């Protein structure tokens, strides 16, 4: 260590290093400029050239004076190197260097060599060793104070480096924990592999809908945004839609808790049972029967409220999320096929379960009637354009057909003027003179071939239901 300091260049003209000021001359006297030999802008300056012109006589330091300065510096360095505390100062300096380049893993040898605890141990060992050999301080108190302050400064550096290391380790630990929590890579890979294989096996059993692959959060949003839909039609009088709903209901027995996957839900081979149950939960028959009963009781609006979901969850022993996912899939797999088949068959909708406008496949209300005084849209929806006028559900004040579930429409007597297919499409336009709203003076429009049971009480009293077929647009002749 002392040899490294000996190699440092020695500079002349240093004040205040314990050497008498008389050796350096007057500190306010002009100093000569040392010769510069590495510049090529002119000849080297003469040693007698000095700063300023106010000094009448140049003050040149003799050679003996320079050697005296070097001797004084050497004595000071020797005093520092020979101080009893210098080995401790060098040790702390090396610890500061090691703190920036040594691995900090607990299992690595020498990882704690630069810690603050090791510094305290080193001080204790050093104090015991030095006291046994020689005292800790020298005869120069100024030098002793300098050594102690230097050791304290390096000690502060070591503590600050240790704080930085702790912050770095804490950040790395929290960052890795956050990544593990947000991205469970192993679980994601296993789930992806299992779902792809299972989907490939189940695709032959049922058709795939794009909406069935949405995460549960998207489906919750779809459930919340579709609550404004109008009522859905029930089973047709011919029983075809009811049979389709029963067959489709088997597809909703087993539903995925996180991602709704296509499939029939029926139990396959026993060797696939464990993998199937791991991928999606198979609900008990009792639970599915309870939820299916609620669904058929509320076909007009198959969207349970939050309180109803909680009650269903308590009755079935499932979670609210499972109940919510079951109804999302049931609306697609049970209700929607019933609507599609009913629209294709064109049967008369049962008023006990259909209380208004049809439920379109796009999830939008199909009703075309509005409140009195509002602008009448007049355009029949796409789902009802292919149906005859006799099959259009009865429209109430809200266009929802507020018929009671126990109500049965009376049989209409045949009439020669009864129109089986209703007026043409252009008569439903608001600007057409044959618009039903103009005939009824802004009230709910009637349709040829429909009874007047869903109209206002005054019309019920003034019109005989048995001659409902004669109530028609007088301009449609």
UniProtKB/Swiss-Prot annotation:
Gene Ontology biological-process entries: eye development; negative regulation of myeloid cell differentiation; pancreas development; positive regulation of cardiac muscle myoblast proliferation; positive regulation of mitotic cell cycle; response to growth factor; response to mechanical stimulus; visual learning
**Which family is this sequence assigned to?**
Belongs to the TALE/MEIS homeobox family.
Q: In which tissues is it expressed?
A: Displays spatially restricted expression patterns in the developing nervous system, limbs, face, and in various viscera. In adult, it is mainly expressed in the brain and female genital tract, with a different distribution of the alternative splice forms in these organs. Lower expression in lung and only basal level in heart, liver, kidney, spleen, and testis. Expressed in pancreatic islets (beta-cells only).
What is this protein called in UniProt? Homeobox protein Meis2
* Basic and acidic residues biased stretches: 193-203
**Annotated region described as Disordered, given as residue ranges:** 193-283
Q: Which organism is it from?
A: Mus musculus
Assembly behavior: Monomer and homodimer. Heterodimer with HOXB13. Isoform Meis2A interacts with TLX1. Isoform Meis2B interacts with HOXA13 and PBX1 isoform PBX1b. Isoform Meis2D interacts with SP1, SP3 and KLF4. Isoform Meis2D interacts with PBX1 isoform PBX1a; the interaction partially relieves MEIS2 autoinhibition. Isoform Meis2B is part of a PDX1:PBX1b:MEIS2b complex; Meis2B is recruited by PBX1b and can be replaced by isoform Meis2D in a small fraction of complexes. Can form trimeric complexes including HOXB8 and PBX2 or PBX3.
Q: CDD domains attached here?
A: homeodomain
Gene name, please?
Answer: Meis2
Q: What is its main location?
A: nucleus
Q: Which domain of life is it from?
A: Eukaryota
Q: Where is this region: Transcriptional activation domain?
A: 340-477
Entry GO CC = nucleus; perinuclear region of cytoplasm
Q: What is its subcellular localisation?
A: Nucleus; Cytoplasm, Perinuclear region
Q: Which PANTHER family match?
A: HOMEOBOX PROTEIN TRANSCRIPTION FACTORS
Gene Ontology terms, MF aspect: DNA binding; DNA-binding transcription activator activity, RNA polymerase II-specific; RNA polymerase II cis-regulatory region sequence-specific DNA binding; sequence-specific DNA binding; transcription factor binding
List the residue ranges of the region (Required for interaction with PBX1).
71-191
Q: Which PROSITE patterns does this chain map to?
A: HOMEOBOX_2
Sorted keywords for this record are: Activator, Cytoplasm, Developmental protein, DNA-binding, Homeobox, Nucleus, Transcription, Transcription regulation
